[in-house]
Amino acid sequence: MSFNIFIASDHTGLTLKKIISEHLKTKQFNVVDLGPNYFDANDDYPDFAFLVADKVKKNSDKDLGILICGTGVGVCMAANKVKGVLAALVVSEKTAALARQHDNANVLCLSSRFVTDSENIKIVDDFLKANFEGGRHQRRIDKIIRYEKETE
């Protein structure tokens, strides 16, 4: 593939991260695992969220990110603090597609506790299959970007 998928999690998402990484590699995606590589109950999700978000922002029109924590909320909040990142917490296949089609999300945030591994795989697949539709949706994204610049 001509783009990277950066993936990371906290300790609660470690197993799911490995499952998703292997799934994507079998589909020939270029997956870059940013950690963790071992279980550490004291790790902090913002550290991994910032790693992925910083990588995605460098090539935000191509590269994508996947972040995992217990709820998906924490990594989503942290990733959205990085300028140029549009992170979406997704818990269903339908919203996975819409996050890309309508919101041009470039970071997918997943819950390892409240969504099954198999459902998360479907969410990832639908997210990656979808493309941004532009049009009226671009106007809305432009407003977000403009506000981000105005409030620096």
Curated annotation (Swiss-Prot):
- What would be an example GO MF term here? ribose-5-phosphate isomerase activity
Keywords in alphabetical order, please. Answer: Carbohydrate metabolism, Isomerase
Q: What GO biological process terms does the UniProt entry carry, in alphabetical order?
A: D-allose catabolic process; pentose-phosphate shunt, non-oxidative branch
User: InterPro entries from the xrefs?
Assistant: RpiB (IPR004785), RpiB_LacA_LacB (IPR003500), RpiB_LacA_LacB_sf (IPR036569)
Where is D-ribulose 5-phosphate bound in this sequence? D10, H11, G70, T71, G72, V73, G74, D103, R113, R136, R140
Say if the entry is tagged with keyword Membrane. no
**Pathway annotation:** Carbohydrate degradation; pentose phosphate pathway; D-ribose 5-phosphate from D-ribulose 5-phosphate (non-oxidative stage): step 1/1
What is the reaction catalyzed?
A: aldehydo-D-ribose 5-phosphate = D-ribulose 5-phosphate
Q: Give the positions the UniProt entry annotates as the active site.
A: C69 (proton acceptor), H102 (proton donor)
**Which Gene3D superfamilies does the record associate with it?**
Sugar-phosphate isomerase, RpiB/LacA/LacB
Question: How would you summarize the oligomeric state and partners of this protein?
Answer: Homodimer.
Give the record's family classification: Belongs to the LacAB/RpiB family.
NCBIfam families recorded: PRK05571.1 (NF004051), rpiB (TIGR01120), rpiB_lacA_lacB (TIGR00689)
Protein name (Swiss-Prot/TrEMBL): Probable ribose-5-phosphate isomerase B
Look up and give the organism this protein is from: Mycoplasma genitalium (strain ATCC 33530 / DSM 19775 / NCTC 10195 / G37) (Mycoplasmoides genitalium)
* Lineage, opening ranks: Bacteria, Bacillati, Mycoplasmatota, Mycoplasmoidales, Mycoplasmoidaceae
